[in-house]
Amino acid sequence: MIRLPADDRASSPYTGYTRAHWEAAADALLAAVEPYATPDRALYHLPGGRVSRSGRLSDGLEGYARTLLLAAFRRDETVLGRYAEGLAAGPGGVWPRITDRGQPLVEAASVALALRLTRPLLWDRLDDAVRGRTAAWLADALTARPWPCNWELFPVTVGGFLAEAGHREEAARKAIDRGLERIEDWYVGDGWYTDGDGRKFDYYNGWAMHLYTVLHAWLSDDGELLARYGRRLSRHLADHARFYGGDGAPLRQGRSLTYRFATTAPLWLGALTGHTPLPAGETRRLASGALRYFLDGGAVDERGLLPLGWLGPDPSFVQDYSGPASPYWASKGFLGLLLPPGHEVWTAREEQAPAGRADAVHPLPAPNWLLQSTRSDGVVRLHNHGSEDVRWDPYYTRLAYSTATSPLPAYDNSVLVGGDPGRTEIEPLGTGEGWIASRHTVRAGITVTSLVAVRGAVEVRAHLVAGAAPGTPVRVTGWPAGEGVRAELLPAAGLSAELAGV
C-alpha cells in the first residue's frame, strides 16, 4: 500500500490530489522495487510466477528500464544514483543484446529517454567508459528491425538521445527519419494513428504514437516537427478527455491495459509542450482521477508493487509478452512531474471532467467509434465499429466497451451467427450525432451490418445478418455484469423474448 498526504479539497475538489500526492506515489513505487534489484543493480527481478515469452533475463532488464523511466520523471538524484550503478554493469554484458524484434529494443527506448531527460543528473556524471558501453549497447537499436507498429518509434527515441550525445550521429539520424516516415502511413487523421497496418485503435495511440513523436520533437527543439505532431496531439486530447469515467476509470479497451495510468501520459504531454485544448485544471483532474481510481482500487499490492492486472492481480489483462515488470510502463503516467511546481497544471483549481458535466454522445469518425456518457453514474461507453485485431482479442472485437465493465470470454456485446462470434474485416459505415454503423464478416459468405442509436443511457442496436442459411440461430448479447451498475437487454424486434436479461 502507498501512504499519501491528506486530501487537498481546496485546490482539488474532485480528486483531492496535488503534486505532493504524485511525488509520494512515485517515491513509494520506486522504493518498493529496490529490494528486487540484483547486487549490481543492472536487473530488477520482480516477484511473480510468470515469465514473459522473452525470458527471465529480458524481464529483469524490463524491470530496470521501466522503473528508471519513473526515476527520470521524479528527478531524485539519490535514486538516479542507484540506476547509475546499474549502467556501470548492465551494458557491459549483463543485459541481453538488442536484436531484431526483441523485447530489449522496447526497453532501450525507455533507457534512452530517461538518459535524455536527466542528462545533467545522470549521463553527464558517468565516467567515459560507462558512457561508451551504454552508447554501444543502445546503438544496436538503430539498425534492429522493429515490429511494424509503435515499435518503429523505439529506434527514433534511441536515435534522438545518441545524436544529442554525439554517438553514431549519422546512423542515429537515419533511424529517426526512417521511423518517423514509417508511422505517417498509419496516421488516419483527427489525432488518430492505427498501431500498424489495419484498424488497430487503442491506447497505444496516446502512450506511444503521440508520446514518442511529440517528446522527440520537443527535446530536439525542432519547431517544425513539434508543430506537426503537436497539432495531432491537441486534436487527440479533445477526444481522449472523454475516455475517463466519473470515478477516474479509463475505458477498458485494447491490449496492455495492465499499464493502467499510463493512459494519462498524453494529458501531461499536452500541458508540457503547450499543445492541448484542455484547461490546466481539467488536465490534472483527469490524470489525478485515474491515479486515484487505481490506488484506491487496490492496483498496488501489500508490497507496494504493481502486479499484472487492473485493480489488483487479474490474468485476463495479461498478454504473452507480459512479464512481472511490464506494469511499470505505468511510469509514463508520471510525465507530469517534469512540469515545475509553479506550472498552472499544478496550481490551477481542478475542473470537472467531461463525464461529470452532462450526458453526452460524441462521434469519433477516424476510428469509427461513438462515445456515450451519462452524468448520473459517470459511466462512459465506447461503441466500437471500427477497431479490430487479428488475434481475436476480446479487448478489440466486442461491439462496445465501458469504464465500468471488462469483456468476458463468454462473448458479451457480440452477435453470434450459428454459434460463431467472429468479427473481422470491419467496414465502417459512418458515425454522427447519436448513431454509428458498420459491417463485419462472421466467416466466409456471412456478414452482419450493425447500427446503434443512443440517447442518455439508452442504446438501440439493430443487426442485419446476410449470407446465413435460413433457420441459422442468431444470438445477440449485451453488457457483462459490472460492479455497481445494471444493464437490461430488451428485444425490440426479430429476437425471442426469452433472450431478455440483465
Give the role of each language-model region.
Residues G93-P96, G245-H385:
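Carbohydrate-active enzyme catalytic cores, enriched for enzymes
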Residues G60-L61, L69-R74, L80-W268:
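Aromatic-lined, polymer-binding surfaces characteristic
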Residues L69, Q372-T374, V465:
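Hydrophobic side chains in beta-strands
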Residues R391-V502:
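Extended repeat-based interaction scaffolds and adjacent low-complexity, acidic/S/T/P-biased segments
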